[in-house]
Protein backbone atom coordinates (compact mmCIF):
# COMPACT_ATOMS: atom_id res chain seq x y z
CA UNK A 1 0.00 0.00 0.00
CA UNK A 2 1.30 3.45 -0.94
CA UNK A 3 0.98 6.09 1.76
CA UNK A 4 0.75 9.77 0.95
CA UNK A 5 3.04 12.12 2.93
CA UNK A 6 -0.02 13.42 4.81
CA UNK A 7 -1.17 9.95 5.75
CA UNK A 8 2.29 8.99 6.92
CA UNK A 9 2.56 12.15 9.01
CA UNK A 10 -0.85 11.49 10.54
CA UNK A 11 0.08 7.94 11.49
CA UNK A 12 3.33 9.17 13.01
CA UNK A 13 1.51 11.85 15.02
CA UNK A 14 -0.98 9.32 16.37
CA UNK A 15 1.83 6.97 17.34
CA UNK A 16 3.74 9.72 19.13
CA UNK A 17 0.59 10.86 20.96
CA UNK A 18 -0.07 7.32 22.13
CA UNK A 19 3.49 6.90 23.41
CA UNK A 20 3.96 10.33 24.98
CA UNK A 21 5.07 9.91 28.59
CA UNK A 22 2.97 11.20 31.45
CA UNK A 23 4.54 13.01 34.39
CA UNK A 24 3.50 11.00 37.43
CA UNK A 25 2.66 12.73 40.72
CA UNK A 26 3.45 10.04 43.27
CA UNK A 27 3.68 12.12 46.44
CA UNK A 28 0.76 10.81 48.57
CA UNK A 29 0.11 14.22 50.13
CA UNK A 30 -0.36 16.10 46.88
CA UNK A 31 -0.84 18.05 44.83
CA UNK A 32 -4.10 18.49 46.73
CA UNK A 33 -7.02 20.73 45.78
CA UNK A 34 -10.08 21.26 47.96
CA UNK A 35 -12.97 23.69 47.92
CA UNK A 36 -16.02 24.49 50.03
CA UNK A 37 -18.96 25.81 48.02
CA UNK A 38 -21.80 23.81 49.56
CA UNK A 39 -24.75 25.82 50.83
CA UNK A 40 -25.11 26.20 54.58
CA UNK A 41 -28.24 25.14 56.43
CA UNK A 42 -28.77 21.62 55.05
CA UNK A 43 -30.78 19.47 57.47
CA UNK A 44 -28.32 16.85 58.71
CA UNK A 45 -31.12 14.90 60.39
CA UNK A 46 -33.36 14.61 57.33
CA UNK A 47 -34.13 11.02 56.37
CA UNK A 48 -33.87 10.23 52.69
CA UNK A 49 -32.11 8.20 50.02
CA UNK A 50 -28.52 8.89 49.00
CA UNK A 51 -27.93 9.67 45.32
CA UNK A 52 -24.56 8.64 43.86
CA UNK A 53 -23.35 9.87 40.45
CA UNK A 54 -20.17 9.21 38.47
CA UNK A 55 -19.15 10.92 35.22
CA UNK A 56 -15.97 10.73 33.14
CA UNK A 57 -15.76 14.27 31.73
CA UNK A 58 -13.36 13.60 28.88
CA UNK A 59 -10.12 15.45 29.66
CA UNK A 60 -12.15 18.16 31.44
CA UNK A 61 -12.55 19.95 28.10
CA UNK A 62 -16.24 20.90 28.06
CA UNK A 63 -16.99 21.90 31.60
CA UNK A 64 -19.97 24.14 30.83
CA UNK A 65 -21.71 21.26 29.05
CA UNK A 66 -20.82 18.87 31.87
CA UNK A 67 -22.43 21.25 34.37
CA UNK A 68 -25.63 21.30 32.32
CA UNK A 69 -25.67 17.50 32.15
CA UNK A 70 -25.15 17.22 35.91
CA UNK A 71 -28.17 19.47 36.42
CA UNK A 72 -30.45 17.02 34.58
CA UNK A 73 -33.24 15.21 36.42
CA UNK A 74 -31.58 11.88 37.23
CA UNK A 75 -28.29 13.50 38.28
CA UNK A 76 -29.49 16.66 40.00
CA UNK A 77 -28.98 16.82 43.75
CA UNK A 78 -26.32 14.12 43.97
CA UNK A 79 -25.14 13.49 47.51
CA UNK A 80 -21.93 11.88 46.24
CA UNK A 81 -20.36 12.74 42.88
CA UNK A 82 -17.16 11.32 41.43
CA UNK A 83 -15.60 12.79 38.30
CA UNK A 84 -12.83 11.29 36.17
CA UNK A 85 -10.25 12.80 33.79
CA UNK A 86 -10.48 16.07 35.69
CA UNK A 87 -8.06 18.93 36.19
CA UNK A 88 -8.07 21.36 39.11
CA UNK A 89 -9.78 24.22 37.28
CA UNK A 90 -12.57 22.09 35.87
CA UNK A 91 -13.24 20.51 39.24
CA UNK A 92 -13.47 23.91 40.91
CA UNK A 93 -15.81 25.27 38.22
CA UNK A 94 -18.21 22.36 38.59
CA UNK A 95 -18.13 22.61 42.39
CA UNK A 96 -18.86 26.35 42.28
CA UNK A 97 -21.71 25.95 39.81
CA UNK A 98 -23.39 23.10 41.70
CA UNK A 99 -22.60 24.37 45.24
CA UNK A 100 -20.47 21.40 46.24
CA UNK A 101 -17.45 20.79 48.42
CA UNK A 102 -14.69 18.80 46.75
CA UNK A 103 -11.40 16.97 47.08
CA UNK A 104 -9.17 16.53 44.04
CA UNK A 105 -5.81 14.75 43.91
CA UNK A 106 -4.33 14.48 40.41
CA UNK A 107 -2.23 11.42 39.74
CA UNK A 108 -0.34 12.76 36.75
CA UNK A 109 0.21 15.59 34.31
CA UNK A 110 -1.44 14.42 31.11
CA UNK A 111 1.11 13.87 28.32
CA UNK A 112 -0.87 15.57 25.54
CA UNK A 113 -3.12 17.98 27.45
CA UNK A 114 -0.23 19.16 29.69
CA UNK A 115 -2.46 19.67 32.71
CA UNK A 116 -3.41 17.82 35.89
CA UNK A 117 -5.28 14.55 35.36
CA UNK A 118 -7.14 12.47 37.92
CA UNK A 119 -10.41 11.71 39.75
CA UNK A 120 -12.32 14.00 42.09
CA UNK A 121 -14.92 13.52 44.83
CA UNK A 122 -17.61 16.19 45.30
CA UNK A 123 -20.57 16.51 47.67
CA UNK A 124 -23.03 19.04 49.09
CA UNK A 125 -22.18 17.45 52.46
CA UNK A 126 -19.12 17.95 54.62
CA UNK A 127 -15.96 16.17 53.49
CA UNK A 128 -14.34 15.24 56.80
CA UNK A 129 -11.02 14.17 55.30
CA UNK A 130 -9.51 13.13 51.99
CA UNK A 131 -6.35 11.62 50.55
CA UNK A 132 -4.65 10.23 47.46
CA UNK A 133 -4.37 6.46 47.06
CA UNK A 134 -1.54 5.30 44.80
CA UNK A 135 -2.46 2.34 42.61
CA UNK A 136 0.06 -0.24 41.35
CA UNK A 137 1.47 -0.65 37.84
CA UNK A 138 2.59 1.78 35.18
CA UNK A 139 0.88 2.05 31.79
CA UNK A 140 2.77 0.16 29.12
CA UNK A 141 2.08 2.96 26.62
CA UNK A 142 2.35 6.27 28.49
CA UNK A 143 4.13 5.00 31.62
CA UNK A 144 1.37 6.63 33.65
CA UNK A 145 0.48 5.59 37.20
CA UNK A 146 -3.14 5.61 38.29
CA UNK A 147 -4.45 6.98 41.57
CA UNK A 148 -7.78 7.07 43.38
CA UNK A 149 -9.15 10.05 45.27
CA UNK A 150 -10.54 8.94 48.62
CA UNK A 151 -12.77 10.96 50.93
CA UNK A 152 -14.97 10.51 53.96
CA UNK A 153 -18.24 12.34 53.41
CA UNK A 154 -20.69 12.93 56.26
CA UNK A 155 -24.16 12.54 54.70
CA UNK A 156 -26.93 13.34 57.20
CA UNK A 157 -24.65 12.30 60.04
CA UNK A 158 -23.53 9.06 58.34
CA UNK A 159 -19.84 8.93 57.42
CA UNK A 160 -19.38 7.25 54.03
CA UNK A 161 -15.96 6.33 52.63
CA UNK A 162 -15.88 7.28 48.92
CA UNK A 163 -13.31 6.30 46.28
CA UNK A 164 -13.28 8.10 42.94
CA UNK A 165 -11.43 5.77 40.57
CA UNK A 166 -10.14 5.57 37.01
CA UNK A 167 -8.38 2.28 36.33
CA UNK A 168 -5.82 1.54 33.64
CA UNK A 169 -7.04 1.35 30.03
CA UNK A 170 -7.10 -1.95 28.07
CA UNK A 171 -4.30 -0.56 25.88
CA UNK A 172 -2.23 0.37 28.91
CA UNK A 173 -2.56 -2.81 30.95
CA UNK A 174 -4.02 -6.29 31.25
CA UNK A 175 -7.01 -7.47 33.28
CA UNK A 176 -4.53 -8.49 35.98
CA UNK A 177 -3.32 -4.88 36.21
CA UNK A 178 -6.86 -3.62 36.84
CA UNK A 179 -7.48 -6.42 39.33
CA UNK A 180 -4.37 -5.40 41.29
CA UNK A 181 -5.54 -1.79 41.28
CA UNK A 182 -8.96 -2.79 42.62
CA UNK A 183 -7.36 -4.97 45.30
CA UNK A 184 -5.35 -1.96 46.49
CA UNK A 185 -8.57 0.04 46.86
CA UNK A 186 -10.31 -2.83 48.66
CA UNK A 187 -7.40 -3.19 51.08
CA UNK A 188 -7.59 0.52 51.92
CA UNK A 189 -11.37 0.30 52.40
CA UNK A 190 -11.14 -2.81 54.56
CA UNK A 191 -9.91 -0.77 57.52
CA UNK A 192 -13.09 1.34 57.46
CA UNK A 193 -16.14 -0.21 59.15
CA UNK A 194 -18.81 2.12 57.77
CA UNK A 195 -20.46 2.29 54.33
CA UNK A 196 -18.19 2.46 51.28
CA UNK A 197 -18.77 3.74 47.73
CA UNK A 198 -16.35 2.86 44.91
CA UNK A 199 -17.35 4.66 41.72
CA UNK A 200 -15.79 5.73 38.45
CA UNK A 201 -14.37 4.51 35.16
CA UNK A 202 -13.08 0.96 35.60
CA UNK A 203 -12.13 0.44 31.93
CA UNK A 204 -13.64 -3.02 32.37
CA UNK A 205 -17.00 -4.67 32.91
CA UNK A 206 -15.81 -8.02 34.23
CA UNK A 207 -13.91 -6.38 37.08
CA UNK A 208 -17.27 -6.14 38.84
CA UNK A 209 -17.16 -9.85 39.64
CA UNK A 210 -14.04 -9.26 41.75
CA UNK A 211 -15.75 -6.55 43.79
CA UNK A 212 -18.82 -8.74 44.28
CA UNK A 213 -16.60 -11.54 45.61
CA UNK A 214 -15.36 -9.11 48.24
CA UNK A 215 -18.83 -8.21 49.46
CA UNK A 216 -19.73 -5.19 47.32
CA UNK A 217 -23.08 -4.62 45.65
CA UNK A 218 -22.76 -4.02 41.89
CA UNK A 219 -25.50 -1.43 41.56
CA UNK A 220 -24.99 -0.61 37.87
CA UNK A 221 -24.49 -4.14 36.57
CA UNK A 222 -27.52 -3.96 34.27
CA UNK A 223 -27.53 -0.22 33.57
CA UNK A 224 -26.25 -0.61 30.00
CA UNK A 225 -23.35 0.75 27.92
CA UNK A 226 -21.59 3.87 29.16
CA UNK A 227 -19.08 4.43 26.33
CA UNK A 228 -19.78 3.15 22.83
CA UNK A 229 -20.68 -0.54 23.32
CA UNK A 230 -18.80 -0.89 26.60
CA UNK A 231 -20.09 -0.76 30.17
CA UNK A 232 -17.05 0.60 31.96
CA UNK A 233 -18.46 3.27 34.29
CA UNK A 234 -19.76 1.63 37.45
CA UNK A 235 -20.90 2.14 41.05
CA UNK A 236 -20.20 -0.39 43.81
CA UNK A 237 -21.23 -0.09 47.45
CA UNK A 238 -20.77 -1.84 50.78
CA UNK A 239 -23.09 -1.23 53.73
CA UNK A 240 -25.68 0.40 51.45
CA UNK A 241 -28.58 -1.07 49.47
CA UNK A 242 -30.82 0.00 46.57
CA UNK A 243 -33.49 2.48 47.59
CA UNK A 244 -36.16 1.05 45.29
CA UNK A 245 -36.92 -0.69 41.99
CA UNK A 246 -35.52 2.15 39.83
CA UNK A 247 -32.27 2.52 41.74
CA UNK A 248 -29.71 2.84 38.93
CA UNK A 249 -29.34 4.02 35.37
CA UNK A 250 -27.33 5.70 32.62
CA UNK A 251 -28.06 9.20 31.33
CA UNK A 252 -27.90 9.21 27.53
CA UNK A 253 -28.14 12.95 26.90
CA UNK A 254 -24.59 14.27 27.36
CA UNK A 255 -24.69 17.38 25.11
CA UNK A 256 -21.24 16.51 23.75
CA UNK A 257 -19.66 16.95 27.19
CA UNK A 258 -17.88 13.60 26.96
CA UNK A 259 -17.63 10.31 25.12
CA UNK A 260 -18.81 8.68 28.37
CA UNK A 261 -22.33 8.68 29.78
CA UNK A 262 -22.87 9.51 33.46
CA UNK A 263 -24.19 6.78 35.74
CA UNK A 264 -26.29 7.12 38.88
CA UNK A 265 -27.58 4.98 41.73
CA UNK A 266 -29.89 5.69 44.67
CA UNK A 267 -29.26 3.89 47.96
CA UNK A 268 -30.11 3.79 51.64
CA UNK A 269 -28.08 2.41 54.58
CA UNK A 270 -28.38 -1.36 54.99
CA UNK A 271 -29.05 -1.09 58.71
CA UNK A 272 -30.50 1.82 60.63
CA UNK A 273 -27.84 3.18 62.95
CA UNK A 274 -25.08 1.54 60.92
CA UNK A 275 -21.40 1.98 61.71
CA UNK A 276 -20.19 5.36 60.63
CA UNK A 277 -23.09 7.29 62.13
CA UNK A 278 -21.72 10.35 63.88
CA UNK A 279 -23.00 13.61 65.25
CA UNK A 280 -22.32 16.30 62.73
CA UNK A 281 -20.52 19.34 64.17
CA UNK A 282 -22.68 21.63 62.08
CA UNK A 283 -25.17 21.86 59.27
CA UNK A 284 -24.16 21.98 55.65
Task: Pin down the residues of each PLM region.
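Catalytic metal-binding/acid-base residues of hydrolase active sites
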Residues: 58, 87, 126, 166-168, ...
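Surface-exposed cleft-lining segments at the edges of enzyme active sites
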Residues: 132-141, 165-176
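Metal-dependent phosphoester-hydrolase catalytic domains
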Residues: 19-40, 189-197, 202-284
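Active-site-proximal beta-strand elements of phosphoester/diester hydrolases
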Residues: 47-59, 131, 159-169
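N-terminal, active-site-proximal structural segment of metallo-dependent hydrolase catalytic domains
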Residues: 6, 16-97, 109-113, 179, ...
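Bacterial N-terminal signal peptides that target proteins for export
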Residues: 1-9
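Structured beta-strand-rich core segments of catalytic domains in phosphoester-bond hydrolases
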Residues: 25-39, 82-159, 247-254
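His/acidic metal-ligating clusters that form di-metal
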Residues: 150-163, 174-213
Amino acid sequence: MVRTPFRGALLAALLLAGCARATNLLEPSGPAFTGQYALLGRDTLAIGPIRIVTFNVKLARRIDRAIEVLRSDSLRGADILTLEEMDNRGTDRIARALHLDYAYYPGAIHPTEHKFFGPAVLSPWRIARSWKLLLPHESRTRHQRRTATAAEVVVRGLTIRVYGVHLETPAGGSDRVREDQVMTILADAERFKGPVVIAGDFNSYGIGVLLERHGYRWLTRYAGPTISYFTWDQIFVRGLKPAGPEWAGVVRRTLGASDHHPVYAVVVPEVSGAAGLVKSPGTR
